[in-house]
Design a protein with these regions (language model features):
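N-terminal secretory targeting signals
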Residues: 1-8, 14-21, 201-216
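Catalytic glycan-binding domains that act on GlcNAc-containing polysaccharides
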Residues: 5-184
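Long, amphipathic alpha-helical surface segments
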Residues: 163-216
């Protein structure tokens, strides 16, 4: 379904879409807009599957924001951290604003001003968060694609490589565990959730080769 249709409070997407439909559309369109040499769609779907059961989370109780669970430090690194604002990345942020202003029908949208980060607390300044946009799947998909653009690694292809990439690149809390049993359990959960929610992509992912998707 085209994103030109009216949005339901700009939270999930066109009014006739489910949350999962909106998430799939958001991922596909964001990857198309910030296209690399290979698709990042399967990997982004794995991240969303592992983080929120592919958008089946409760925004009010989730620890971070949106279907990809963008936390304060990650948001700061993507949009505000002075040391990461290369000229190339600044251009990406400008393109992200151009894209999302049209998609959200908000000429004042600024992806770098959705929250104010406090480096001392490693959290957002109280009352600085724009929850409507931080929870929006289109915004989350763009932030996720931008985060991948910042990385030097290749976009992982194939389920096993994607699970390893999720652990290394997205670095969920469990990735810091020293317990091999916990690590194996969480890796299996990430894989199983991706297969459960993205059957077609799980088959395609096994057949894809590893190529770079960071040539912007």
């Amino acid at each position: 379904m085209s994103s030109r249709f009216p949005y339901n409070n700009l939270t999930y997407g066109p009014v006739n879409e489910t949350k999962q439909d909106s998430l799939t559309r958001a991922i596909t369109e964001a990857d198309e807009y910030f296209k690399g040499s290979v698709s990042a769609v399967p990997f982004m779907k794995l991240i969303a599957s592992a983080e929120t059961d592919y958008g089946r989370h409760n925004d009010e109780t989730a620890l971070s924001y949106g279907p990809f669970q963008i936390d304060p430090i990650r948001y700061f690194d993507i949009t505000q951290a002075p040391g990461r604002m290369t000229e190339k990345h600044k251009k990406r942020l400008s393109k992200a604003n151009e894209y999302l202003r049209k998609k959200l029908n908000d000429p004042n949208f600024n992806i770098s001003k959705l929250a104010v980060y406090n480096p001392e607390t490693k959290d957002y300044v109280k009352d600085s968060r724009n929850l409507k946009y931080l929870r929006n799947p289109d915004v989350g998909a763009v932030l996720t694609r931008l985060a991948l653009k910042q990385r030097p690694e290749q976009i992982p292809q194939g389920i096993e490589n994607m699970v390893s990439g999720y652990e290394k690149i997205w670095a969920p809390k469990w990735s810091q565990s020293k317990d091999a049993g916990i690590l194996d359990k969480k890796r299996k959960e990430a894989k199983d959730k991706f297969v459960k929610y993205n059957t077609e992509e799980s088959v395609m992912a096994e057949n894809d080769k590893v190529n770079s998707a960071f040539n912007f």
